[in-house]
């Protein structure tokens, strides 16, 4: 959600996230593609809720860098309240799995890092947004 007058991303970075979303063939609402990058740079804020400091969100986003395009799509869905929170959160998980598959390839289940990403990281992120995202979803409704 656009609470800050200071953007988290530049317009160029938003376009790079869009390119990555195309590369990974992520599922995204029309708003993600239709809105101008200069607007979305205030909407997309990386991983974590708006109520967190930028420092915390940057740290988490850096730790989960591979999934950044999925987070940008999720931010757009929350900001414009597209569909339902549950549908948005499920799309985030599906998009993270697409990224995981592409990055770890055929050997994804044979690599320890691949298994950790799929069995720990992705479910943890999904649980966090499914449980804690309600407040952010409501905040978007009240703006």
Residue ranges and their predicted role:
Residues 1-143:
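Extended terminal accessory/targeting regions
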